[in-house]
Amino acid sequence: MVTSSQIKAARALLKWSARELAEVAQVSLVTLKRYEAADGIPEARLEQFIRIKQALEAAGIEFIGNPLESPGVRLHKKA
């Protein structure tokens, strides 16, 4: 699982606005903002959550750690 803080951090690493991520992930901006405002692991519909996670991973984000202990993100530059 991915935390709301990881989603925000990943977006910051990519220098994406919330609107950009919502468009790439094909979710509404309201949905994305709700997930980012959550404390810890957002309560999300699985389909939307997977879209957000996959959009970030496709852009080079790697989610590291686990949600309960030292969650983080890192950016892999594309070759």
Regions of interest found by a model, annotated:
Residues I7-E20, K77:
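Short basic helix-loop element that most often maps to the first helix and adjoining turn
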Residues A10, V24, Y35:
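Residues in the recognition helix of alpha-helical DNA-binding motifs
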Residues V24, R45, E69:
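Residue-level "edge-of-site" marker
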Residues Q26, L46-F63:
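DNA major-groove recognition helix of helix-turn-helix/homeodomain DNA-binding modules
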Residues I61-A79:
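Helix-turn-helix/homeodomain-like alpha-helical modules used for DNA recognition
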